């Protein structure tokens, strides 16, 4: 999987394919808040996302408070966003929709 930093146009294209994700301040990360009906659903989402992240060897910055999960994705080694961030974001969206 490519860990090459994406340019502005590639980032805009990637965001156009992702519901509810936003470019974080500074433009080097994307962020989304997921809200579930309860803690069990939030934790189940995090478990599925963690397994996908491990498989991709790409790990999110996230916090969980009760039924809310805030996620920030960036590729620290590349100093910005890469294809991995968008791939993991798409997987997270799919898991949240289940």
UniProtKB/Swiss-Prot annotation:
Gene3D superfamilies: Transcriptional coactivator/pterin dehydratase. Its EC number is 4.2.1.96. One of its GO terms (biological process) is tetrahydrobiopterin biosynthetic process. Keywords: Lyase. It catalyses: (4aS,6R)-4a-hydroxy-L-erythro-5,6,7,8-tetrahydrobiopterin = (6R)-L-erythro-6,7-dihydrobiopterin + H2O. NCBIfam families: PRK00823.1-2, PRK00823.1-3. It comes from the Bacteria. InterPro entries: PCD_sf (IPR036428), Pterin_deHydtase (IPR001533). The keyword Lyase applies. It comes from Chelativorans sp. (strain BNC1). Pfam families: Pterin_4a. This is Putative pterin-4-alpha-carbinolamine dehydratase. One of its GO terms (molecular function) is 4-alpha-hydroxytetrahydrobiopterin dehydratase activity. Belongs to the pterin-4-alpha-carbinolamine dehydratase family.
């Amino acid at each position: 999987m490519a860990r090459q930093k994406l340019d502005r146009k590639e980032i805009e294209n990637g965001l156009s394919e992702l519901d509810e994700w936003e470019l974080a301040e500074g433009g080097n990360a994307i962020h989304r808040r997921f809200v579930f009906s309860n803690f069990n659903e939030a934790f189940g989402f995090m478990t599925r996302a963690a397994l996908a992240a491990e498989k991709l060897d790409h790990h999110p910055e996230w916090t969980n408070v009760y039924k809310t999960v805030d996620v920030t994705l960036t590729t620290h080694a590349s100093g910005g966003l890469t294809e991995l961030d968008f791939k993991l974001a798409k997987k997270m969206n799919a898991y949240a929709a289940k």
